[in-house]
Curated annotation (Swiss-Prot):
Species whose genome carries this gene: Corynebacterium glutamicum (strain ATCC 13032 / DSM 20300 / JCM 1318 / BCRC 11384 / CCUG 27702 / LMG 3730 / NBRC 12168 / NCIMB 10025 / NRRL B-2784 / 534)
Name of the molecule in the record: Cytochrome c oxidase subunit 2
Membrane topology annotation: Multi-pass membrane protein
Annotated Gene Ontology cellular component terms: plasma membrane
Lipidation (S-diacylglycerol cysteine): C29
Pfam family, one: COX2
EC supergroup of this enzyme: translocase
Length: 359
């Protein structure tokens, strides 16, 4: 009888390990998680992703919760079984001793209970790295490269490279502004300044990118970054002052923006395979950066490829035109629709009205 009980315990432990590993194996699958109410529950508040990278992260997140619930149910089941089946009162009713049967020195069981958790962690780590590599890979062959500059407390977006299929004249577009870029490079050194570090200038902006087509956010206007749907895109990030973080919730991903990113050995670039939905999506700074950090928003406006090509052509041909005029030209709302500017004037917010319309 004792030998049978031992075999039963081994089988239960093995079953628990198999179920746990099975759940974790699902975590690395590209299979979409359940939909409906169950799917919403498993997402635990995560928004629906609009890039393949976001979908991969969302799938991984949901299936990890499936694995966690499977393992949790098994462990709580064993825990409650031990409480109610082997409790002192139950043992007393059965006429057994005060202490339940002891299982120490059961080497096979101890090995199972040691090895299975290690394998679970290893499997989870494997699929974590697999998903992370997909998200951070720089192999997307981008057709649009956007320079993103964060500063207290707004954003500047510029187009540095655009594939010929989306650019004016059908030729690859190089958007760097040579004159301003040269001026930025010249700001690097200031031998006559009071900075003691090898004559480096305090106002060095040589690491920032300056483009002919740019969208600059202001206190009164949320910057709208226009991008094409179904197109690989690269983002090149930097900060003009303190640490910021570029975050679009539907990307399920954020990347910090630092001053002098190369000198700080931080990765300033990330790529997405495509954006799968058109529409307006709010973007935010996800790094505490000072007084108005919470109001440092922008909007991602995703349009079809033809509209994006027309948008770029209009801005290239009309350098003095505003971003709002270019958006109107392609039939889009001229100002942000997903978020509003914050009125920073204290005297204007006494009644609690702290947003204003661009209209």
């Amino acid at each position: 009888m004792e030998q049978q009980n031992k075999r039963g315990l081994k089988r239960k432990a093995l079953l628990g390990g198999v179920l746990g590993l099975g759940g974790l194996a699902m975590a690395g699958c590209e299979v979409a998680p359940p939909g409906g109410v169950l799917g919403d529950f498993l997402r635990m508040g995560w928004p629906d992703g609009i890039t393949p990278e976001a979908v991969a992260m969302g799938n991984f997140w949901s299936w990890v919760w499936v694995a966690a619930w499977i393992i949790g149910i098994i462990m709580w089941g064993l825990f409650l079984t031990a409480i109610f089946a082997w409790g002192a009162k139950r043992a007393e009713k059965r006429g057994e001793g005060e202490f339940p049967k002891q299982l120490q020195y059961n080497v096979p069981l101890e090995l199972v209970l040691t090895i299975v958790p290690i394998i679970i962690v290893m499997v989870l780590f494997f699929f974590t790295v697999q998903t992370q590599d997909k998200v951070t890979a720089l192999d997307k062959n981008p057709e649009v490269t956007v320079d993103v500059t964060a500063y207290q407390w707004n954003w500047k977006f510029g187009y540095s490279e655009i594939d010929g299929s989306l650019a004016p004249g059908g030729q690859d577009y190089q958007g760097s502004d040579p004159e301003r870029q040269a001026a930025a490079e010249a700001s690097k050194k200031d031998p006559s300044g009071d900075n003691p570090i090898h004559g480096n200038s305090k106002s060095d902006v040589s690491y920032l990118e300056f483009n002919r087509i740019e969208t600059l956010g202001t206190t009164d206007e949320i910057p709208v970054m226009v991008l094409p749907v179904n197109t690989p895109i690269e983002f090149n990030l930097a900060s003009a002052d303190v640490a910021h973080s570029f975050w679009v919730p539907e990307f399920l991903f954020k990347r910090d923006a630092y001053a002098h990113p190369e000198a700080n050995k931080s990765q300033r670039v990330f790529q997405i395979e495509e954006i799968t939905e058109e529409g307006a999506f709010v973007g935010r700074c996800a790094e505490m950066c000072g007084t108005y950090h919470a109001m440092m928003n922008f909007e991602l406006r995703v349009v079809d490829r033809d509209s994006f090509a027309e948008y770029i052509s209009f801005r290239d041909s009309n350098p003095d035109a505003t971003n709002a005029q270019a958006l109107e030209h392609i039939g889009q709302a001229p100002y942000a629709t997903s978020t509003s500017p914050f009125v920073s004037d204290r005297t204007a917010t006494r009644d609690g009205e702290n947003t204003q319309s661009n209209a």
